[in-house]
């Protein structure tokens, strides 16, 4: 994730009820730090989303274990609700598989966000539990997908550190 992309991400504002996903107030320098787990999804030079992996993909409150690689992300707000989530998340998972070779992926999604839950279920994720975040008290769903064989694709070319 470049500094310019990170500066863009921290301005993204989603409509209610998805505004809990806003990154306003986040430090763009942290997102752009090569040591962080944040990566930009770029299409023809334009930032369309981001994906985070490891600790940066977690919500505080779930039991931390290494049975799966945590991943989170976001799509540019004006692109949400247009059926792009599956391709964006799928591309991110391909990238994560190539880069990290995890035994499984784990996503944590706000319980109210049924739209995102449907998308990840279509990508093979299954429920692993529910918890309340320690920082906000919000309810979250945890879904896991066992690792599959690496696919062939150009996902690595679309992701930028």
Predicted stretch roles:
Residues 1-9:
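A short beta-loop-alpha structural element at the N-terminal edge
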Residues 11-78, 95, 99, 146-148, ...:
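Acetyl-CoA-dependent GNAT
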Residues 70, 104, 115:
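Amphipathic alpha-helical recognition patches that constitute DNA-binding helices
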